[in-house]
Amino acid sequence: ASYSPGFALFILGGTGCRKSTAIGLALSYFGAFHAKNLPASFDDTSNTIRKKAFILKDCPIVVDDYHPETSLQERRRMESIAQSLSRAFGDGTDRGRLKADLSLREAMPPRGVAVMSGEDMPNIGDSGTARFYVVNVGQQDVPITEELTEAQEMAKRGVLRRVMRGYIEFLQPRADRLSKQLETRWLKLRAQAIKETQGAHKRAPEALAHIMLGYSMMQDYLVSVGAMTDEEANADFLDAWRVLVENSTEQGKEAREERPSKRFISAISELLVNQTVTVKDLSIHSATAEKGMIGYVDADYYYLLPEMSYTTVSRLYSDQGMTFPLSKRLLFRQLRDDGIIVPDADGKTTKSKSVGGKIVRLLWIPRRFLDGDT
């Protein structure tokens, strides 16, 4: 088909929830894998992982174990890998690089799909995390049951690999017409996903369509060999679709809460509450700036000093070993576009205000955003 996957699956769950067990079992359709011998991990270098992703054509590559780190250097190393991989799998591209003689090195873009796992989400900004389709795994979601043990025994005996071989043999005689059929089915699934995932990230419908396309094709094979009936396949498809729609919608809500604009407002609010910074009441104080002052307030608005407020939040992030994900200019645009600040008549992000007899340009923020009334 003409539409390649533009996402990586990210399995998110705390230690001990057996997410690697589930991933290893799924990967057993492609080889002799289990939780302890997955193809790659975040302890590998970015170049190593990308080379493996190029070699594993038409196969999933698992990158396991993104975990919290007390070492700032190690945390940033893993974040850099996550950022690199999100771009590579989200865009299907490879970085342009030169050889020692300055000639172009052959590109090695990913040629399969990626499954990553971690105890935490990488701090790689809006754009980076948007390329992940996140599945949360709770402590009780992968229980140790007879069914799990039986599935692991089947994987160990190579049963799952034989199922995948049968599926590929099922596809082979259909290869000439598959491209058009897959494209038509994918477009239909995406259109339906767009209707049903209002509020989700714009990338979510495409990811959902790709996942369900693969799911439905495997169902076609299982029906053809009598492993399930058409009625069972339809019921399972609708159930899986419902779960993915709900997950996509929830992921969209979480992403909005993690937008830099929301994080900026949350940081300012916290700094005001703990009195690390202050604002002057325009009905009482003059315009004289004091240490820790980041703006002004009246009955309706907070008026933040643009440079001071941005620098203060950036410093807060730096003190926590993080980098605020947007430049000042892009942040203010996002605040405007999200309806958090009131722009001037020309759409500029700062607006004139008379303070102590002087006209200054400030960020106008309705009080409800910082006082916790939204």
Residues covered by each model-derived region:
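Residue-level preference for the first positions of well-ordered beta-strands
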Residues: 6-10, 60, 113
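Short glycine-rich substrate-engagement loop in P-loop NTPases that contacts/grips substrate
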Residues: 25-60, 76
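Ser/Thr/Asn(+Pro)-rich, low-complexity disordered segments
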Residues: 36-50, 94-100, 132-134, 138-144
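Conserved nucleotide-sensing/catalytic segment adjacent to the nucleotide-binding pocket
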Residues: 48-100
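AAA+/SF3 P-loop NTPase mechanochemical coupling elements
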Residues: 54-56, 98-116
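Extended alpha-helical interface modules used as scaffolds for assembling large macromolecular complexes
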Residues: 73-77, 86-92, 104-108, 113, ...
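Conserved helix-loop functional segments at active or binding sites
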Residues: 1-4, 28-41, 68, 88-96
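P-loop NTPase catalytic core of nucleic-acid-dependent motor ATPases
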Residues: 1-36, 208
